[in-house]
């Protein structure tokens, strides 16, 4: 049995439960998912670089006190979250974030990838994170923001949120030229159907949480691990 730890790096339990409700219905065979929400001293949402740094520090302290007994890590935050790099430096076990998993999956399915996300502040942050993966603008159509804060995805009226998601997805396709769309927030995990209805049956909608689970399960099955030669070598080993 492959054990994957799905980490919500914010302290909002409702977001963890939302991701769990989707993943529990599509877990691959012989895979066991375990879930961890950031302890209460962490941020309630990841809305800026500082939030990411804070949550990574809180979670790494948690792992010092509670060594993880799993085969892989999925960081369920759509950002270039520092916890991904920190876990890769600390463990040999495969680790990915949902941003990385969704982009790699999307590039297997189309030629122009766009991300529908939350606040406008995330547009440059996600653009920088995706470029840091080595993804060029020849295949990256850009970031389309709804203007909603992550927690507003569930706190605002459902019809209002759905309408914003639909309009933003259509903008990504019609104005930005996207032929694949990634859900740019873990809080959108249960909203893929809204975008699918808006853009029609020819545009794949990628949920990074699902893509991340499938990617990590494949890496573990192939007995692959995080490279320890280079940037992810153990601290102090060079």
From Swiss-Prot:
It comes from the Eukaryota. SUPFAM superfamilies: Aspartate/glutamate racemase. GO terms for molecular function: amino-acid racemase activity. InterPro entries: Asp/Glu/hydantoin_racemase, Asp/Glu_race, Hydantoin_racemase-like, Iso_Racemase_Enz_sf. GO terms for cellular component: cytosol; nucleus. Pfam families: Asp_Glu_race. Coiled coil: none annotated. Belongs to the HyuE racemase family. This is Uncharacterized protein C1F7.10. The lineage of its organism: Eukaryota, Fungi, Dikarya, Ascomycota, Taphrinomycotina.
């Amino acid at each position: 049995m492959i054990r994957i730890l799905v980490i919500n790096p914010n302290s909002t339990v409702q977001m963890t439960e939302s991701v769990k409700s989707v993943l529990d219905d599509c877990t691959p065979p012989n895979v066991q998912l375990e879930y961890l929400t950031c302890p209460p001293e962490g941020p309630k949402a990841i809305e800026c670089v500082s939030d990411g740094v804070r949550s990574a520090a809180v979670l790494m302290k948690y792992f010092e006190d509670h060594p993880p007994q799993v085969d892989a890590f999925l960081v369920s935050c759509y950002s270039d979250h520092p916890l991904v790099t920190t876990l890769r430096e600390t463990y040999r076990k495969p680790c990915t974030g949902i941003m990385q998993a969704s982009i790699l999956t999307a590039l297997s399915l189309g030629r122009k990838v766009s991300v529908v996300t939350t606040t406008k502040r995330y547009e440059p942050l996600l653009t920088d994170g995706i470029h840091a993966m080595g993804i060029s603008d020849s295949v990256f159509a850009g970031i389309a923001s709804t203007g909603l804060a992550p927690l507003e995805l569930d706190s605002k009226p459902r019809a209002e949120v759905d309408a914003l998601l639909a309009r933003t997805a259509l903008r990504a396709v019609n104005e930005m030229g996207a032929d694949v769309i990634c859900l740019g927030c873990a809080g959108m995990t249960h909203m893929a159907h809204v975008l699918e209805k808006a853009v029609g049956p020819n545009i794949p909608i990628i949920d990074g949480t699902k893509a991340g689970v499938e990617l990590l399960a494949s890496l573990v099955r192939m007995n692959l691990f995080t490279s320890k030669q280079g940037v992810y070598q153990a601290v102090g080993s060079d």
